[in-house]
Structures are given as structure tokens and as C-alpha cells.
UniProtKB/Swiss-Prot annotation:
It is a peripheral membrane protein. InterPro entries: ATP-synt_VA_C (IPR055190), ATPase_a/bsu_AS (IPR020003), ATPase_A1-cplx_bsu (IPR005724), ATPase_F1/V1/A1_a/bsu_N (IPR004100), ATPase_F1/V1/A1_a/bsu_nucl-bd (IPR000194), P-loop_NTPase (IPR027417), V-ATPase_su_B/beta (IPR022879). Has multiple subunits with at least A(3), B(3), C, D, E, F, H, I and proteolipid K(x). GO terms for biological process: proton motive force-driven plasma membrane ATP synthesis. It comes from the Archaea. Component of the A-type ATP synthase that produces ATP from ADP in the presence of a proton gradient across the membrane. The B chain is a regulatory subunit. Belongs to the ATPase alpha/beta chains family. This is A-type ATP synthase subunit B. GO terms for molecular function: ATP binding; proton-transporting ATP synthase activity, rotational mechanism. It comes from Pyrococcus horikoshii (strain ATCC 700860 / DSM 12428 / JCM 9974 / NBRC 100139 / OT-3).
Length: 465
């Protein structure tokens, strides 16, 4: 039953993105507010805090040019809802869901609460199916699984935007009968970055199966709190109403957390670590936990949030708390970036906790689990020997040690590195892994069973063919 709307002109204070309305009754937390100026301009807001006879309202379009005396506030009695429709595929919206691509307004099939419906943990299905991104360092070493939440930890100046666009363009589920979509939400990005994403999606045709939400750096910070929730609400609609497999890419979650800190400071809340609000963990969980699968439903939501680590500090509160909630991380390396390697994914600190359940026979290939373990071990050994060479010189190494050094160099140049438009199948990725392992003596392949070596090692594969 819809509550009656109430209008007030009793604004007592405006500061930052917030306004305080006095003398209100029956106002609820999260309620949508319509703000009207003397000139008739309308803006939207949401109740952040409701107390006896007083409400704190956050204004989505910002409070600039609002006058306390001539501005009226109407409490609608509804929570914030986003209009959803299959017609949203192929469209670009701003951070609060208004079309910015010159196309018509969306005629909604339904309106959904941006906070989503709580998902009973018992109703969740365990993620088990492989998603192919076409990027070897992810598919081969840190596999993405349907329903997983796998963040990318980046740093300022690293090519995470290019990586996000490449994943959005190339990601697919194997099997023609499966329908796949990408929901892309960018928060606090520059005009240059927004144009890059628009151009990348439109020129490659990826826009046809995508929904884009773009919140710009000069948009009000408060919009950044809404943007990822808008995107996830649309993703839930596509996944659970239309049985689609949806990949949600959120960038940059650091900008989201900065907006959270800004609003918390405006509300004069007691700060937590480094000034971020104490409830940031819970707030991030309300976003990340909307990934997953539901028993009895075909659709799924897979999340790849991207965040830039301030000062490349992986112990910073944002990556630290994100790591607690999500199921692994893809870490970008400044050292690899300096070497000219794209994408600069450092596979050693990277991890996909659900990888073991999404690979192997019937999913990728039977040799995948053992091959990945052997590649990890060999690359780790090569990296360790690099440090040793810096101390004792290469002359002190054995022939086998030199092979490991060669392997580490070629692994970075040939396996990790690939072109921006290079889309490798999982078979190509695994075969490339075996080619690199052939550098090492067969006696060093201790993590791969003999029958796998006989079947997939290039030396034996060429003989059988």
C-alpha cells in the first residue's frame, strides 16, 4: 500500500550534498524525496537519516543554487526504484539511470527497488561453471566462474580501464544456448575515460549486449552511491527474469568509497580507519553479495569490481575489506607495466578461490588443474631465481636454474602478455601453457601426472599427430 506524499518548506540547513528538513512526521529511512526550486526546477533525493521531527536528505543532483527559503521538499513515501526493461540492452545511462545516448526514454516493464531483494543463503546455488574472458592470465591461472565475485586490484596509471573494456567485449559462456549480457557501471570517471568506454563498446559491437551506467567525476558524489545499485538491479532483472548470464563490471570502487567517506563526513559521523565510515564493510557487502546464482533459476550474476589501491597499498581499507567479502583477486603489477606487458597481471598474488570448481574435465579441459599448478610453481621458482641472480650472478646457476629463468621471462612475454584485441580460447591458453613448460626438463614437471604429459606435452603431441 503506497503511503501519501507530504510536502514541506521547512529546510533549516543545506551543507555539501545534504539538507536538513525540520518539522517532518512519518518519514522513513531510504524514502525518495522530490525537491522543487522557486523556478520550478526539480531534483531528486533520498532520506539518509530520519529522527523525531527531522530528516536528513541527500540530493542526487547536488545542492548548488538551492535556497532554504524558496525550496520545497516532497516526501513521496516510496523507496528509490529503477525502471527496468529488455530495451535497456544497447543503451547508455548516467549514474542515476537517465539515458545519455540520445535515444528515447525507456518504457519500463517494471520498477525495481535499487537495493534489491534479500537473497536467502539456502536458496543460493554454488558457482561451478566457467566464464571465458579470452585473457590467458585469468582463464588459465585465475579462472572466473559464473556467480563469482572476483575483484581487480589496480593502481593509479595502470591500464585497468582497457582491461575492463576488453573483458566486457570478450567475455562469454561456452555453449550457444546460453544468453549472455554485460552490465557496466563506472563511478567518478573523467570525460576522457567515459568517451573511451563509449567508443570501445560501440566500435566493437559489444554495446548490443551491454547496459552502461556512467557517473562522471564532476557529477555529484552522492550519485556514486546509487550507480552500482542501479546497475545490479538491472542485472538481477536480466538474470532472474530472463535467465541471462550477466557479468557486472564496477569501476572504480575506490571512487565509490571516497563518496561514502565524503557523505559520512558531511553527516559528522565518527570516522573509522583513515577517515572511512565504520560501516564501510557492511556497505560494500550490500553490493558484492548481490552476485551469485539461485537454485532452480538458469540465470547468474558474476561481478568483477575494479578498484585502484591508493599508493599501491594492498593493505589499504578498501582492498582489505573487499578481499574479505569477495572470492579472490586479480592483482595488476606496476613492475610488469613498466616492462611493457599488457595486461600487467601478476599471477602470484592473484587468486580465484572458486577456480577449482569451475575447471577440469567437462568444463575447460582435463589437464587444466594440474597445468595451472605447474605453471604457478615454475613461475614462482623463476621469480625467486631472479632475486638470487641479482646477488650472485647468473654464472653461479645450474643449467636447470637457467631454464627456469628463461621460463619466467617467456611466461611474462608470451602467456601473460597479449594484445588488446587478442581473444584467446581456453584451448589456446592451455596449449600455450604446455609450450612454455616444454622449456623445462620433463623431470621438473612434478605437479603433472605422467598420463597428462604423454597426452598434452608438445613433444608427445607432435609424435602422435
Amino acid at each position: 500500500m503506497m503511503k501519501m506524499s507530504k510536502e514541506y518548506s521547512t529546510i533549516s540547513k543545506i551543507y555539501g550534498p545534504l539538507m536538513i528538513v525540520e518539522g517532518v512526521k512519518g518519514v522513513a529511512y531510504g524514502e525518495v524525496v522530490e525537491i522543487e526550486t522557486e523556478s520550478g526546477e526539480k531534483r531528486k533525493g533520498q532520506v539518509l537519516d530520519a529522527r523525531e521531527n527531522m530528516a536528513i536528505v541527500q540530493v542526487f543532483e547536488g545542492t548548488r543554487d538551492l535556497d532554504i527559503k524558496t525550496t520545497s521538499v516532497r516526501f513521496t513515501g516510496e523507496t528509490l526504484k529503477v525502471p527496468v526493461s529488455m530495451d535497456m540492452l544497447g543503451r547508455i545511462f548516467n549514474g542515476i539511470g537517465k539515458p545519455i545516448d540520445g535515444g528515447p526514454e525507456i518504457i519500463p516493464e517494471d520498477r525495481r527497488d535499487v537495493h534489491g531483494a534479500p537473497l536467502n543463503p539456502v536458496a543460493r546455488a554454488y558457482p561451478r561453471d566457467f566464464i571465458q574472458t579470452g585473457i590467458s592470465a585469468i582463464d588459465g591461472m585465475n579462472t572466473l566462474v559464473r556467480g563469482q565475485k572476483l575483484p581487480i586490484f589496480s593502481g593509479s596509471g595502470l591500464p585497468h580501464n582497457q582491461l575492463a573494456a576488453q573483458i566486457a567485449r570478450q567475455a562469454k559462456v561456452l555453449g550457444e544456448e546460453e544468453s549472455f549480457a554485460v552490465v557496466f557501471a563506472a563511478m567518478g570517471i573523467t570525460y576522457e575515460e567515459a568517451n573511451f568506454f563509449k567508443k570501445s563498446f560501440e566500435e566493437t559491437g559489444a554495446i548490443e549486449r551491454a547496459v552502461l551506467f556512467l557517473n562522471l567525476a564532476d557529477d555529484p558524489a552522492i550519485e556514486r552511491i546509487i550507480t552500482p545499485r542501479m546497475a545490479l538491479t538491472v542485472a538481477e532483472y536480466l538474470a532472474f527474469d530472463y535467465d541471462m548470464h550477466v557479468l557486472v563490471i564496477l569501476t572504480d570502487m575506490t571512487n565509490y568509497c571516497e563518496a561514502l567517506r565524503e557523505i559520512s563526513a558531511a553527516r559528522e559521523e565518527v570516522p573509522g580507519r583513515r577517515g572511512y565510515p565504520g560501516y564501510m564493510y557492511t556497505d560494500l557487502a550490500t553490493i558484492y553479495e548481490r552476485a551469485g546464482r539461485i537454485r532452480g533459476r538458469k540465470g547468474s550474476i558474476t561481478q568483477m569490481p575494479i578498484l585502484t589501491m591508493p599508493d599501491d597499498d594492498i593493505t589499504h581499507p578498501i582492498p582489505d575489506l573487499t578481499g574479505y567479502i569477495t572470492e579472490g583477486q586479480i592483482v595488476l603489477s606496476r613492475e610488469l607495466h613498466r616492462k611493457g606487458i599488457y595486461p600487467p597481471i601478476d599471477v602470484l598474488p592473484s587468486l580465484s578461490r572458486l577456480m577449482k570448481d569451475g575447471i577440469g574435465k567437462g568444463k575447460t579441459r582435463e589437464d587444466h588443474p594440474q597445468l595451472a599448478q605447474q605453471l604457478y610453481a615454475a613461475y614462482a621458482e623463476g621469480r625467486s631465481l631472479r632475486d638470487l641472480v641479482a646477488v650472485v650472478g647468473e654464472e653461479a646457476l645450474s643449467e636447470t636454474d637457467k631454464k627456469y629463468l628463461e621460463f619466467a621471462d617467456r611466461f611474462e612475454r608470451e602467456f601473460v602478455a597479449q594484445g588488446y584485441y587478442e581473444d584467446r580460447s581456453i584451448e589456446e591458453t592451455l596449449d600455450l601453457g604446455w609450450e612454455l613448460l616444454s622449456i623445462l626438463p620433463e623431470s621438473e614437471l612434478k605437479r603433472v601426472k605422467k598420463e597428462m604429459i604423454m597426452k598434452y606435452h608438445p613433444k608427445y603431441r607432435k609424435r602422435s599427430s
